[in-house]
Regions:
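Exported/periplasmic ABC-transporter solute-binding proteins
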Residues: 1-29, 35, 40, 44-53, ...
Length: 233
């Protein structure tokens, strides 16, 4: 019998997985060995032949890895989506990002907006800036951008500590962070879909499928919603 399932997990799903893991472990009498990775690190793990039983990874990363022959999962499915969102330190002004006009006004009202440095292995900042450029907000956003070396959760933590006035990253890397007020998801015009794909590796033990079944259940879906993810049907 397998005593441990090795899991490769995207940073955007980290808060959910850390909440889900103890419940699954208690119910099934085994341990989840969790490895969290940015998209670039996920790719590097796959290129290096990293061994794992199951995972929740960014869908586009898995699709590219499959196309390149680096991943051959037994099966996979779209588990959840994390929209892009914005947050400010708790106690700050109640700003709005509900519409594109609101978002533009909020940017203009701030002096610094933290983004994850692409060197950290995530492409969120590039996607956000490209969308802002198309909408005429790029110059304003770039003038305020502060790039922090780390995934979105680290960037949000830095904002909570006062290193910048706001953060833009995945909602699931803002909502769970203590000391951050989640302003809401960015307007649809600014969105890029970050889908989380759950997968079972080829020749994985039956417990890996049990984890997939659990992730599809209502308890898991409720936890996902609580950290800013939108579960897929």
């Amino acid at each position: 019998m397998t005593d441990q399932l090795d899991i490769l997990c995207a940073g955007g799903f980290r808060a959910a997985m850390e909440a889900l893991a103890p419940r699954f472990e208690a119910a099934h009498g085994l341990r989840l060995g969790l490895t969290f990775a940015t998209p670039a690190a996920t790719r590097a793990h796959l290129e290096a032949g990293f061994s794992f039983h199951a995972g929740v990874v960014v869908a586009s990363v898995l699709a590219k890895a499959q196309a390149d022959g680096l991943a051959t999962p037994a099966h996979s499915f779209k588990l959840a989506v994390s929209p892009l969102g914005m947050g400010t330190p708790e106690g700050g002004p109640a700003l709005s990002v509900a519409t594109l006009a609101d978002f533009g006004a909020t940017i203009a009202a701030l002096e610094s907006i933290a983004l994850s440095d692409p060197k950290a292995g995530t492409n969120v900042a590039n996607e956000v800036l490209a969308a802002a450029d198309k909408l005429g907000l790029g110059e304003s956003l770039r003038a305020r951008a502060l790039f922090i070396n780390g995934p979105g959760s680290v960037v949000s933590g830095a904002v909570a500590q006062g290193h910048a006035q706001a953060v833009i990253t995945l909602a699931s890397e803002i909502v769970p962070i203590e000391g951050i007020r989640f302003l809401g998801r960015l307007p649809q015009e600014m969105q890029t879909e970050y889908a989380m794909q759950a997968l079972v590796a080829d020749r994985a033990p039956p417990a890996a499928q049990a984890l997939m079944d659990y992730l599809r259940g209502e308890e898991a879906r409720e936890i996902m919603r609580g950290v800013g993810l939108e579960p897929c049907s």
